[in-house]
Swiss-Prot record:
InterPro entries attached to this UniProt entry: HMG_box_dom_sf, YABBY, YABBY_C, YABBY_N
Name this protein carries in UniProt: Protein YABBY 4
A molecular function GO annotation: zinc ion binding
Span of zinc fingers (C4-type): 30-57
GO cellular component, one term: nucleus
Entry's family note: Belongs to the YABBY family.
Entries under PANTHER family matching the protein: PROTEIN YABBY 4 (PTHR31675:SF46), PROTEIN YABBY 6-RELATED (PTHR31675)
Location, primary (coarse class): nucleus
Cell compartments where the protein resides: Nucleus
Spans annotated as Disordered: 127-168
Gene: YAB4
Keyword Zinc set for record: yes
Tissue specificity statement from the Swiss-Prot or TrEMBL entry: Preferentially expressed in immature organs containing meristems and organ primordia. Expressed in phloem of developing vascular tissues of young seedling shoots. Expressed in the phloem of midvein vasculature of young leaves. Does not show polar expression pattern in leaf primordia.
Record keywords: Differentiation, Metal-binding, Nucleus, Zinc, Zinc-finger
Length: 256
């Protein structure tokens, strides 16, 4: 029990005949050809679901008239348009024209496009968020290990070369002992004067260089620069000099 009629997206309402008192005029939107259909529904079927055939594209539409008459809290299907009570009344054609101008198909298409764009944006943002940790973490670089030294390596390998200690010569030993002997006999003498006197004693005793024995020694006087009394050389001097000469001979020192 349904009737259908087709019209263009914008149609004059003057050509529409006023419905009979036993029918209710309803307007249904065809989502296939984007056409608004004016349907006359009997009053006995206002709260039923009727089938409407589009006169423009012959598409069958299932229309719930209860949703058209009473606004429901849930959103209506895409193929139905909600009109106020003034639109359902056949005596207010101008109000219907105003509502149709606002509820154009282009507005519906924009709403659908915005919904699809928001869903695509949400999916892309979630995929970017899931890929963000992988992009932020750079690949780990291999750690270069330094070659380990063997544990049993000798410690002397890293030790700097030691300086070889030279054995003091017979001359150095004689000068050292002679300076100590001169300072013991004359404590007031300076180190420079004692060294000069020790060097003169070494030069004035050629028998020391030849390694003569202490029993062949002789006495010699020494006159210091400060005019002090002559110091008599003792037998201990010859013994020390002889020992120094013997050590020098053992080291291969040639006599003068």
């Amino acid at each position: 029990m349904s009737s259908s009629s087709s019209s263009s997206a914008v149609f004059p309402l003057d050509h529409l005949a006023a419905p009979s008192p036993t029918e209710q005029l309803c307007y249904v939107h065809c989502n296939c050809c984007d056409t608004i259909l004016a349907v006359g529904v009997p009053c006995s079927s206002l709260f039923k679901t009727v089938t409407v055939r589009c006169g423009h594209c012959a598409n069958l539409l299932s229309v719930n008239l209860r949703g058209l008459l009473l606004p429901a809290p849930a959103p209506a299907p895409a193929n139905q348009l909600h009109f106020g009570p003034s639109l359902l009344s056949p005596t207010s054609p101008h109000g219907l024209l105003d509502e149709v101008a606002f509820q154009t198909p282009s507005l519906l298409m924009e709403q659908a496009a915005s919904a699809s764009l928001s869903s695509i944006t949400g999916r892309s943002s979630s995929s970017c968020a899931s890929n963000a940790p992988a992009m932020q973490m750079p690949p780990a670089k291999p750690v270069q290990q330094e070659p380990e030294l063997p544990k049993n390596a000798p410690a002397s390998a890293n030790r700097p070369p030691e300086k070889r200690q030279r054995v003091p010569s017979a001359y150095n030993r004689f000068i050292k002992d002679e300076i100590q002997r001169i300072k013991a006999g004359n404590p007031d003498i300076s180190h420079r004067e004692a060294f000069s006197a020790a060097a003169k004693n070494w030069a004035h005793f050629p028998h020391i260089h030849f390694g003569l024995m202490p029993d062949q020694g002789f006495k010699k006087t020494f006159k210091p620069q400060d005019g002090s009394e002559d110091i008599l050389l003792k037998d201990s001097l010859y013994a020390a000099a002889a020992a120094a000469a013997a050590a020098a001979a053992n080291m291969g020192v040639t006599p003068f």
